[in-house]
Amino acid sequence: MCGIVGIVGHQPVSERLVEALEPLEYRGYDSAGVATMDAGTLQRRRAEGKLGNLREKLKEAPLSGTIGIAHTRWATHGAPTERNAHPHFTEGVAVVHNGIIENFAELKDELAAGGAEFQTETDTEVVAHLLAKYRRDGLGRREAMHAMLKRVKGAYALAVLFEDDPSTIMAARTGPLAIGHGNGEMFLGSDAIALAPFTNEITYLIDGDWAVIGKTGVHIFDFDGNVVERPRQISTAAAFLVDKGNHRHFMEKEIYEQPEVIAIALGHYVNVIDKSCRSDSDAIDFAGVESLAISCCGTAYLAGLIGKYWFERYARLPVEIAVASEFRYREIPLSPQSALFISQSGETADTLASLRYCKAHGLRIGAVVNARESTMARESDAVFPILAGPEIGVARTKAFTCQLAVLAALRAGAGKARGTISGDEEQALIKSLAEMPAIMGQVLNSIQPEIEVLSRELSNCRDVLYLGRGTSFPLAMEGALKLKEISYIQPKSYAAGQLKHGPYALIDENMPVIVIAPHDRFFDKTVTNMQEVARGGRIILITDEKGAAASKLDTMHTIVLPEVDEIIAPMIFSLPLQLLAYHTAVFMGTDVDQPRNLAKSVTVE
């Protein structure tokens, strides 16, 4: 959720550290800080709020030194104040930390009983005090680091400076952390994209690893203190891509990138020339499995729900899907089959824990991820990249539709492998997928004016209801989630057939009801539900040309999209939902790219 960077080398580092934090802003944060060491003395600057505030602090009181660590913080333990911002200092020890120390209360009581005086409300400070205690007890720096790691529990990434060692950064992970190799200098980052301005040669630590980093190299140890080797690899992270271009926000840019990135993603899985599935769609033996488990969180979970409809209907493959935070606690009776995990970052803590749970039970693991260098990708048997490129806005847009595109291609591969679709049906499906990017471009180029008018009206509402049937139900949930995330309106979403089971009581003349209803096999039933709503609510109907002609309902507004094949409808119909949320948030003046309390990558449970 936070960002860590570190540099040890031969040039002044304070400004470079702040620059390295900038690509990590997309993760979300509420304070920032930097620490350097010069002439054997630790020094730091911290600021509440954005990096601009930290830059002002550094402008007023610059930091010197060729070694340092820096951090952006999302408050978990303790308020988002300068006092609670990292780095934390204790007796010649400086610490920055991502994640949660789960046993911090127990450790804090123990340390306080021994005389430790805590200056902050954070869990991180116990790490600094533990290290200081072990140094007082006579342990060397490495021994103190190892002893501390034996005591703390949780998912974390750490970077540490010792005041009596002016040439070394120590680091540890049970969460994302990468080491960058430079020319006479070394780098540390919680995301390879932070290191992209400096190097593309990366070593990824694995859970339990800790490292001693000097300007000419790194020594890596496992949890037991044994020296280990981790491979270097060339990272594809590209800092120059993290740019809004001519758009007001990253979210707007990413919405309009969808036709291009979906074309790239589809090209990886289907051959649009001969209209057939590529071998990448066969990385899981769909012909041999009797069932499929899917686990994911947030928007990825909603993509997974749509995937469940597709796999079950078109490939006749039973799917068990659960939110990752609940998945392993349900103790699902897992057969030795396959499991699919969906995550943009590939670092989502709950999803990663579910992946490891399934792996321990002998399942073959597939990962649908955007970050091909992520922990989830590295721990999976088969990786299905969504190829969306960097997504900076916290609210998922292009990652969602690319996840759907990949799941649609996998569904085609599964249907082919299981003999549930014919060769002609495979070709028709891939023809529809191949046409999708152009249709998405047409929609994005045509609907913005009417979306802006609707969004201005929605910005005055406190509540909005979203309805859908079939795959349009998860899409309704996704539309509500997008509006909730970035506008702070409180939308609700339901299966259209559930109106009379409670939700109908919410509807009055002031409530907009957004109904997603392509003219599919569910359309007539959805129209019946809309007739009930029309007696008291204001309907915004999102449908296609055939649906608009057939509905004959008095609506507040009807958004008419092209008539498309059922398999690509979720991707096409997601576009007005994304734009409605975006423009509503813009009219309300919220922080669209970094909404309050939310982070791009949730790396703690």
Swiss-Prot record:
Location in or out of the cell: Cytoplasm
GO molecular function terms listed in the Swiss-Prot or TrEMBL record: carbohydrate derivative binding; glutamine-fructose-6-phosphate transaminase (isomerizing) activity
EC number: 2.6.1.16
Enzyme class, spelled out: transferase
Domain Glutamine amidotransferase type-2: 2-216
Keywords for the protein's UniProt record, in alphabetical order: Aminotransferase, Cytoplasm, Glutamine amidotransferase, Nodulation, Plasmid, Repeat, Transferase
One cellular-component annotation, GO: cytosol
Induction: In response to a plant signal such as luteolin via the regulatory gene NodD.
SIS domain ranges (all copies): 280-420, 454-595
Pfam families xrefs: GATase_6, SIS
Entry keyword annotation includes Repeat: yes
Residues of the active site: 2, 600
Function of the molecule: Involved in the production of the root hair deformation (HAD) factor specifically on medicago.
Name of protein: Glutamine--fructose-6-phosphate aminotransferase [isomerizing]
Naturally occurring in which organism (per UniProt): Rhizobium meliloti (Ensifer meliloti)
